[in-house]
């Protein structure tokens, strides 16, 4: 389909809390939306993408988890599509560095739940429960935050906020 422009930090749509979508209403255009999200995420080498990062107001996110690939073969990914996702359970705590396609060049240590349970619809409109830990848990939390109008830097240590703001000002000069 199409590689879309990535919405950047400071654009209003990134701060909108997206409402759940009606799957039956969405279904006729879902394949095209998912293909655009897939193509865009792969083009920018992202691990995940929310619909509002390409300017859409649908409560949809997509995540790519690297699979074990035999040596010499191209990297393969397991794709997760979550529609109307809600985190229903969180356990543990882990700190790791995060970045975002909407804030290119910025990496910040962020604290997240170590494992989560998410209720959502899959791309066929069926209800699913995802039990996630590790990178998948982190990526789901990051993308669901986007759908809730939050950005990963909202979770940063408050002492780092002035430094993050300064770095964002510098980086944003290079964003197109």
Curated annotation (Swiss-Prot):
Gene3D superfamilies: Peptide deformylase
Binding, Fe cation: 100, 142, 146
Reaction it catalyzes: N-terminal N-formyl-L-methionyl-[peptide] + H2O = N-terminal L-methionyl-[peptide] + formate
Enzymatic class: hydrolase
Cofactor: binding comment: Binds 1 Fe(2+) ion.
GO terms under biological process: co-translational protein modification; translation
Record keywords, A-Z: Hydrolase, Iron, Metal-binding, Protein biosynthesis
Record-annotated active site: 143
EC number: 3.5.1.88
SUPFAM superfamilies in the cross-refs: Peptide deformylase
Family to which the UniProt record says this protein belongs: Belongs to the polypeptide deformylase family.
Protein's name in the database: Peptide deformylase
Organism, as annotated: Elusimicrobium minutum (strain Pei191)
């Amino acid at each position: 389909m199409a590689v879309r422009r990535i919405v950047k930090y400071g654009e209003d749509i990134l701060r909108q809390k997206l409402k759940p979508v009606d799957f039956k209403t969405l279904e006729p255009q879902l394949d095209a939306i998912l293909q655009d999200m897939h193509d865009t995420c792969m083009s920018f080498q992202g691990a995940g993408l929310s619909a509002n990062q390409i300017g859409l107001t649908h409560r949809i996110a997509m995540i790519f988890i690297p699979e074990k690939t035999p040596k010499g073969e191209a990297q393969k990914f397991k794709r997760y599509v979550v529609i109307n996702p809600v985190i229903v359970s969180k356990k543990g705590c882990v700190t790791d560095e995060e970045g975002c396609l909407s804030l290119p060049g910025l990496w910040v240590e962020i604290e997240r739940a170590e494992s989560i349970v998410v209720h959502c619809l899959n791309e066929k409109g069926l209800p699913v429960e995802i039990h996630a830990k590790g990178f998948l848990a982190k990526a789901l939390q990051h993308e669901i935050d986007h759908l809730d109008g939050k950005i990963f830097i909202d979770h940063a240590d408050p002492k780092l906020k002035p430094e993050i703001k300064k770095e964002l000002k510098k980086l944003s000069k290079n964003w197109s």
